[in-house]
Amino acid sequence: GQYINRVQFFDKTLFVDGITGPRTAGYHPEPSMPTFAGKGETASFGVLKEVQPSVAYLFETGVKTEGGAGVIAWWKDADNCAYVGLDAENRSWYLRTLVGGKENKESYALPEDFHWGVYHHLRIERNGGCLKIWLDEIPAPGRHVFAEAVPAEEAGVPGVFDETKSALFEGATYTIGFDDVHFQL
């Protein structure tokens, strides 16, 4: 092999170090702690603000929580958004939407053997006004397709939320998809 033990990007510069020791010459920067957004907590904390809004996308992440955390399925502003969360107190998951400031919340029971405090995979597929919700790689229990959950023409961005300030998120992926709202096959 090539015996490379460090490959790092610092800003837009790639650094590749070979086998190193305490006296090896070269640039050896100290690693930094990972950060998310870096903008501090606001009403929209956890929203992916630096990405392109869309009406068709896939957003998925792992979430480890004791309850009170989940994903923001759609965010335009504080009065126009949708949350998919896990609720340990009621052993359920929910879809909470605000459209024009009007709130709607639907809750669905989780299986009896659902474990809290371990990673669960949440996947949101948005196509226009339709949201499809997947939990641990299968359709969310109770209901997983919400045909008119959000306004079809209102672009937005996804994100994560944590009401308990103790949840962990891993491997968030945001992929803008083909907007087929106006096409019928």
PLM regions: where:
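Extracellular glycan-recognition regions
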Residues: G1-L185
